[in-house]
Amino acid sequence: MAALALFVMTAWSVGAVDTTITADTLTYNGNEDTAQAKGNVVITRGTAKMTGTEGLYRFADQSATLSGGVSYVDGATSLTAATVTAYADQSLAASGGVEMHADDRTLRGATITYRPSDGYGTIDGNAYLAVPGTEMTAGHVEAYVNEIRMIGTGGVSLSHPEQAFAATADAITYTQTPGADDGFAVLTGNAHAVQNGNTLNGPALEVRLKEQAVETKGRSTLVIRGGQ
């Protein structure tokens, strides 16, 4: 018991930063080189902090998995989920009602992976991604949220209320310069776009939101709202 108590109270070095695990019960498995934590688990690594009800730390790859109402916070990044795995490079894999905030970006889905070093993330299962002024929903979203570049596939919708723009397609790629209102969307497969009440349908559309300019690809239909 004395050795276990010392283990609970002591931080150990992991690469360039220290990792500390605190819990009601900690068990070290020398054969598997893991530490299992149960009850009011708190894991800190550098500036990051995770809390949950049960956790497992793997010394081999320096990864930590927490489950049970998990909360993760690191600076301007926060995440809640049923289960979260944090890796040595600070990347995250979360599942179960995941909601994440990174600065002014919001991500939601059944599962989310995120890499803070370059802002790359994936969202699966009722995927939702919001960046300033624009929202995307899809079955799957792949994005670089720092530079605002996202690709949605599977029943995708995109909206920009300030530009009175809404669209749906099988796949949508959207890019925007951070801090600028220069959104550009490429819609492919059953593309449908509405801006200021005017509707365009076609196999593919390219939309520059601020200029309210649309280029069609293939045979398309434009429906102009009455009075315009």
Q: Model-predicted segments: where are they?
A:
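Mature-chain termini and adjacent capping regions
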Residues: 1-228
